[in-house]
Amino acid sequence: AKLQNLPDDPRASKANVPVLVVSMGPTGSARGLLVRILGQLNAPYGKSASTDTLYPDVLRLLRTSGVKILVIDELHHIEKGNRKQREEALATIKLLGNDLGITIVGCGTIAALRTLRWDPQIERRFEPHRLEVWGHNEQTYGLLNSLETCLPLRHASGLSDDKIATWIINESEG
């Protein structure tokens, strides 16, 4: 696969965003998630708008933008809320999946798994996959080689050279 830098088409009637990535936000609230989705889609919203007011706008925009996969990072932040807030955040994620029929990918720390376990229905919708820590091993070097072949550079960058690979591993903290 090649990475392409495709500029926005000003003549297009609507945005086409097959994969949308958002962060749960520091409070882990349902409203915060909806506001972040609207922000990623450059959509205006009322600063005091409630979750119930924002939700239909988010649905409409996700549909018209062609979103097929919604990636929610920092899912473990839901844990910061009280029981009612956690239930509302998880219910909102569940409703987005139901109403849109899209794939939702949740990312976060091990606490994200605990968060999902608060709602058995939502827990069944997510299959956990653990990402291993990067190290000086065949998998890491293979990934770096694969990335290098995808980068549209004039000259090879040598990502898997020991010196560069060590720097990447150290800077990313594995």
Mark where each language-model region is.
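Conserved P-loop NTPase "ATPase switch" module shared by AAA+ and STAND
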Residues: 61-85
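P-loop NTPase Walker A phosphate-binding motif
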Residues: 1-14
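The catalytic "switch" region of P-loop NTPases
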Residues: 77-82, 89-170
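Conserved NTP-binding/hydrolysis module of P-loop NTPases
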Residues: 18-20, 24-46
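Short, structured loop/turn "capping" segments at alpha-beta junctions
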Residues: 44-48, 68-70, 103-104, 154-155
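Central P-loop NTPase core of STAND/AAA+ ATPases
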Residues: 42-64
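The conserved phosphate-sensing helix
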Residues: 172-174
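Short loop/turn elements that form and flank the Walker-type P-loop nucleotide-binding site
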Residues: 15-16, 64-66, 98-101
